[in-house]
Amino acid sequence: MAEDPHILGLALGGGAFRGTAHLGVLKALEEEGLRPGFLCGTSAGAMAAAFYAFGMAPEEIRNVARNLRWLKATNFTFSKLGLLSNNEIGKFIEKYLGEVLIEDSSIPLAIVAADISTGEKVVFKTGSLATAIMASTCIPGVFLSELRLADSHPATDR
C-alpha cells in the first residue's frame, strides 16, 4: 500500500441489496493500493463496513452476503411497533464475526442509526457490533425495535 499522509474515510449508505455495490468500491480501492483509515456505515452499508473493518475481503463479504436470506433473517411478530424482529441479523453478524465490539475492529468503525423518538442521529463507535447493526438496519413500522438506546428510546435506520 502506498504511504500517504492523508487518511481516506469512507461512508457507506443503506439500500438493502444495493448495499452490495459498496463491495465494488472497496475492491476498486484495494486494486489502487488504497485502504480506508476510517469506515462509517448505515443499514446495508453498516454491514459491509463492519465485515471489511473486521478483516474480510470484498469477495469474501459478497459470499457471506449471499448466505443472508432476508426472510430467514427476520421473525414475524405481532406488535403495533413493527411486523418483524431483526434479532436474526444480530445472530448472523455473530455467526461470521463472533460477539465482537466495534472498538476492536482493525479499521476504526462507526455504525449510524437514528433515535426513532426524536429522529436524531446515533453514532455507535463502541459496544456490541451486532447490537449496533441491528439498530442501523431497523426500519420503522417494519422491524420492531427491541434495542433501546441509553435514554430508553428505540433505534432505527431512518
Segment roles from a protein language model:
Residues 1-42, 50-158:
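Patatin-like phospholipase
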